[in-house]
C-alpha cells in the first residue's frame, strides 16, 4: 500500500492524500507536479526512475488506512534540470 507522503521532497509543499499534484517514483519518492516538471524533468533525482501521478486514496479509506505524516525533505533542495 502506498504511504502517501505529505510533502514535496524539493520545496516542502504540502501534498495531502487527495492532491492531484503529487508525483511519485516506484520507491515513493514524492514531489509536487511543479518541481517534477520544471526542476526534475519527470525523473526522480534519487533513483533515476520516472515520476508519475500519485493515485488519490478515497476519503472513505483514509481512516482505516491513513496517509503518512513523516516528511522527507532534501535540505539542499533539488538541482535545476540539466540541459541535454
Swiss-Prot record:
Pfam families: DUF1272. InterPro entries: DUF1272 (IPR010696). Residues 8-47 are annotated as: Cysteine motif. It comes from the Bacteria. The cysteine motif may be involved in metal binding. This is Uncharacterized protein R02474. It comes from Rhizobium meliloti (strain 1021).
